[in-house]
């Protein structure tokens, strides 16, 4: 890489490091809250049960655990507060990179609120479904084998602990996806306020870069048209529709015939594909889990 390229990339690398630290902080906070909810749910549940486990007791166990570790967890005050706090920080910093003047506008605050709400919903929805089969299996085993309360408590703690997200593999994707999208929305808000017409996707360019990000890197998109897509998405209230409105990429975008056999980073996305990606909300990171792409302004 030429010296100029190295020097101009340093601020981006430093910013990426700071972004990663923020994502890890959010992941750590969510892990702690999940563990607390898990332990509290077990303790509260077994305080209500008799020694002998009945069919009714099994139903209570299933309902309480699924609620505590699913919807109730995602909607808890602690989790909602953390999600909102970190999304606000990511959004604000991204906006200030392009427009340092003034504070967050009402439109910015609304975007943060919507992003926070949808992230909290899917946090509870996904994990509730993830642990549901295991809870049902363990409680049925308690009935079949005549396990007592303490024995079932031990089984649940041991088995659920095995699928609980102790590491960053699950929470890293959750926190990264939430904050990368917040940064993208914040960056577009800042560019619009600063009068910037176009932005460019910038991939990392290292050995971990995927074909999707490599192909999109260097592609230019309209700030105004992307702003219109964001506004449309923010008006969606149904969580399923919101998720579908800005889906992750499943394959690299269409490229021009003369560049299709080149390395991903050297390919050129077609004009028609740029229009399609913008319309379908697929022109902003994250393009997939743990996406590390960023946005930079295009100098006219």
Could you tell me what each predicted segment is?
Residues 166-300:
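Acidic, glycine-rich two-metal-ion catalytic cores of nucleic acid-processing enzymes
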Residues 1-165, 264-285, 296-300:
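N-terminal leader/targeting and assembly helices and adjacent pre-domain segments
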């Amino acid at each position: 890489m030429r010296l100029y390229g190295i020097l101009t990339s340093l601020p981006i690398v430093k910013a990426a490091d700071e972004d990663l630290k923020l994502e890890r902080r959010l992941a750590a906070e969510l892990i702690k809250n999940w563990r607390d909810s898990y332990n509290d749910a077990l303790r509260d549940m077994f305080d209500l049960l008799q020694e002998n486990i009945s069919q009714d007791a099994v139903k209570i166990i299933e309902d309480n655990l699924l609620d505590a570790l699913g919807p109730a967890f995602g909607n808890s005050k602690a989790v909602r507060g953390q999600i909102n706090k970190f999304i606000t920080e990511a959004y604000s910093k991204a906006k200030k990179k392009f427009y340092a003047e003034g504070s967050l506008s009402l439109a910015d605050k609304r975007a943060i609120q919507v992003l926070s709400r949808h992230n909290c919903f899917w946090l509870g929805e996904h994990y509730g479904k993830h642990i549901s089969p295991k809870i049902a299996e363990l409680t049925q085993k308690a009935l079949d084998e005549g396990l007592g309360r303490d024995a079932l408590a031990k089984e649940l703690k041991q088995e659920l602990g095995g699928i609980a997200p102790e590491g960053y593999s699950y929470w890293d994707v959750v926190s990264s996806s939430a904050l990368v999208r917040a940064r993208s929305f914040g960056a577009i808000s800042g560019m619009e306020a600063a009068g910037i017409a176009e932005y460019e996707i910038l991939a990392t360019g290292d050995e971990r870069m995927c074909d999707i990000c490599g192909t999109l890197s260097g592609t230019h998109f309209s700030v105004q048209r992307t702003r219109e897509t964001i506004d449309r998405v923010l008006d969606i209230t149904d969580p399923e529709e919101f998720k579908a409105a800005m889906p992750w990429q499943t394959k690299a975008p269409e490229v021009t015939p003369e560049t299709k056999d080149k390395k991903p980073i050297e390919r050129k996305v077609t004009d028609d594909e740029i229009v399609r990606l913008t319309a379908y909300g697929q022109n902003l990171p994250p393009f997939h889990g743990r996406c590390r792409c960023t946005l930079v302004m295009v100098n006219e």
